[in-house]
Design a protein with these regions (language model features):
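Catalytic alpha/beta active-site cores
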Residues: 1-253
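Subunit-assembly interface segments of extracellular/virion macromolecular structures
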Residues: 257-258
């Protein structure tokens, strides 16, 4: 819903008010406070590793203090607060200069919610890669993801935009140490099943290569770029989804391929 006077402008105060209320209700639901509610909050600070929430001169804290993980910026004027619920993080961005914060009593400009903690990159034919040319694009994108240098530059409405992988996010933990969280989903790559073949590579007799074997070798080779730097895997592992295995023989063959 938009107010009639601001429907065509860059920022609509009525919609902004509704978004702010929605954000505060979200915080109230998952991070309730001791004696106050999030709708009335005017500021934040960090004191001796504790997260202090302010309503003017009144101080309070989270009911569950363990949900506070860390912050970014000055302890008396933090620029970000990191909270955690069910092993998922949220980041409260505080930026008085941001256009979106002008209407918020605590200068909250954004609430970033961790989601899609894992993402599957699909190489299956008939879905993402119908022919050899499509397959090359899939492999190229997967290689860029594993190397960390994948980006896309495009024009829209006369402006040039660049999309690239988000860097890791750095904070200060509540015990004063450096805290780093991943800025990207954990990526898995889906290979095809055993029954398909691909014209991308032909064998000596002119027959097409089994596509599952081709996927296994090329996607695994691309992952070698990530094993040591651990930009994707936290443990230096490779994550491959192998679908459509019909019984123990095909499962055993998959095990043979990857070992």
């Amino acid at each position: 819903e938009q107010s009639e006077n601001n429907a065509s402008q860059r920022y609509d105060p009525l919609r902004g008010e509704m978004v702010i209320k929605y954000g505060r209700d979200f915080l109230e639901k998952y991070f309730p406070l001791e004696n106050l509610n999030w709708q009335s909050i005017t500021g934040f600070k960090i004191s001796d590793g504790s997260f202090i929430i302010l309503k003017d001169n009144i101080e309070t804290s989270l009911k569950n203090k363990h949900k506070f993980i860390g912050h970014r910026g000055d302890v008396n004027n933090p620029s970000a607060i990191i909270l955690k619920n069910n092993n998922l993080h949220i980041e409260i961005i505080i930026d008085p200069k941001a256009f979106s914060a002008q209407q918020d009593s605590a200068n909250i400009s954004d609430i970033i919610v961790e989601a899609a903690i894992s993402t599957i990159c699909d190489n299956e034919d008939s879905v993402a890669a119908v022919d050899a040319e499509d397959k090359i694009i899939c492999y190229k994108n997967w290689l860029g993801l594993m190397k960390g240098d994948l980006k896309s530059i495009f024009k829209k409405n006369g402006k040039t935009y660049e999309r690239k992988l988000n860097p890791d996010r750095s904070y200060i933990s509540k015990d004063g140490k450096k805290l780093k969280l991943h800025g990207r989903s954990l990526l898995l790559v889906r290979n095809v099943g055993h029954l398909m073949t691909s014209p991308a590579i032909t064998l000596k007799d002119g027959s097409e290569i089994p596509e599952g074997i081709m996927d296994a070798f090329i996607t695994s080779a691309a992952c070698l770029h990530d094993i040591n730097k651990k930009g994707n895997s936290r443990s230096g592992s490779i994550y491959i989804v192998k679908p459509k295995m019909h019984g123990p023989d095909e499962t055993s063959f998959t095990d043979l391929i990857f070992t």
